[in-house]
Structures are given as structure tokens and as C-alpha cells.
Amino acid sequence: MLYSATINVMVKAARRAGRSLKRDLGEIEHLQVSLKGPANFVSLADKRAEEILYQDLAKARPGYGFVGEEGGTREGSDKSHTWIVDPLDGTTNFLHGIPQFAISIGLVREGTVIAGVIYNPANDELYIAERGKGAFLNDQRLRVAGRRQLNECVVACGLPHIGRGDHEEFRREMTAIQDRVAGLRRFGAASLDLAFVAAGRLDGYWERNLSPWDIAAGQIMVREAGGTVSDIDTPGDALVTGHVVCGNEFVHGELAKVLRKAA
């Protein structure tokens, strides 16, 4: 399938970083005998992957800014374009050898995400979206699920990290949603949760206190698959607030309504 030059640049970078992570994943089990070994190793794997992404993206688009989870912000001469990158979304899964993690690359132009790539090297699933051109998984067009009854829906969420977030608020939200849906899941990688909504595997997803690199690529993925994404508490931009809820138009609206009442 033919994609734009920008998408090809993103895919090439994601695949190269993915090969690095896949090699590192194979080493994790050998480090489990050491308490500090695996965590330190994963930190290095994360940084290696980000540096690969930075090198490849900067070479192809030298003026663009770069925001990465590990290295922070690197200013570019082109102030209108910025890469927003998570080199390893699902770090805890990776640390435990669970193959639910991803590389997430979003391209923002003047505040709007215009392209996204999410790649899970463990199963070679490559999600691609470009503004106005649709969303794809391994070249197959994606559409969000069409269910219109919450009691038929499977929904994913994220858990607040230890020492961060409002755990009581989350418990209220989880209880309110759990009482209304067919199933509730927690997979541990925000970018893939968003991608799963785009692919129709999940009907909806919500999570609070995310960072831009968690959301950027997944947000355009859901929208290009026909879904709706917003802040939880307002119709605003989740990329700005860090609080995301999504699904098809109906599911998004119902989830947002329940979550706002529970907050």
C-alpha cells in the first residue's frame, strides 16, 4: 500500500527502534535473577529506542522539534512541526516479558496531530493514521466498533500509578463503568488501548493523567477510524489535559456522561 513520505519516515524509524526493543525483550528473562538488573536494563532499552527514533526522524526532517518521554524537548528550527514520541509505552509489561508494549510516534503541526504510527514489535502489528486519509493496521483499513448499548461493550481503562493520580476518583469511575458494561480490561499501554479502539477490538477507553506522548498517535488513530476522542471532563483536547475518553460517537458520549457524574 502507498503511504505518504512522512508516514514512510515514521514507519522506518518505528521498525528500526522495534528491532532494538525486540532484541532487548529476549534478554529480559536472563536478568530476572537480579533485583535491580531488569529495571536498569529496561531503562537503557528505553533510551536506546528513543535515540534511534530521534536519529532517524531528525535525519529525515532536520528542522522538526522532538518531544520524547526519556530525553524531553529538543527544539527545532521549524516551529510548526514537532514529533511526539514514546519509545516504549508499556514499560512494566516489557519488564515482565509481557508482549503488550509499543513505540508511539505522533506528528503535530501547529498544535494539531496530523499523523501517527504505533508499532508493537512483539507481534509485528503496525498501526498507521494520517489526517484525512484513514487508519490502518498492517495495511487493512480500520473502523471503530458500532455497538450502541453500553451493556454490550468491552471497555479498557488505565490505573493511577502508585503515588500519582486520584485513586479514590478512579475507584468511583471504575465502579460506575463496571456496573454498565459487558467487560472492563486493563492492558497497561495507553497507545495500544487507543489503537484497539480504532481497530474495533475495544468499544471504549478512558484514562487520566497521561502525557502527550501517550495520546498523540492514538488520538488520530481513533479519529481516522471514525471514532470520537476528547478530554473526560470537557469537550476539550485530551492532548492538552491528559484525561482521555474515546469510542464511537455513542459510546464516547455515554462513557463521558458516566465518568463526569462519578468524578
Question: Which role does the model predict for each range below?
Answer:
Residues 1-88, 250, 257, 261:
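N-terminal subdomain of lithium-sensitive/metallo-dependent phosphomonoesterases centered on the IMPase/IPPase/PAP
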Residues 10, 14-17, 116, 135, ...:
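Small-residue (primarily alanine) positions within well-ordered alpha-helices
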Residues 77-136:
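DPxDG-like acidic metal-binding loop motif
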Residues 21, 46, 57, 91, ...:
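Residue-level signal for inorganic ion chemistry
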Residues 113, 141-143:
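Short, solvent-exposed loop/turn motifs
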Residues 143-263:
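An extended, acidic
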Residues 34, 75-77, 110, 128, ...:
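Solvent-exposed alpha-helices and their adjacent loops that cap or buttress functional pockets
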Residues 47, 51, 70, 87-90, ...:
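Generic detector of well-ordered alpha-helical packing
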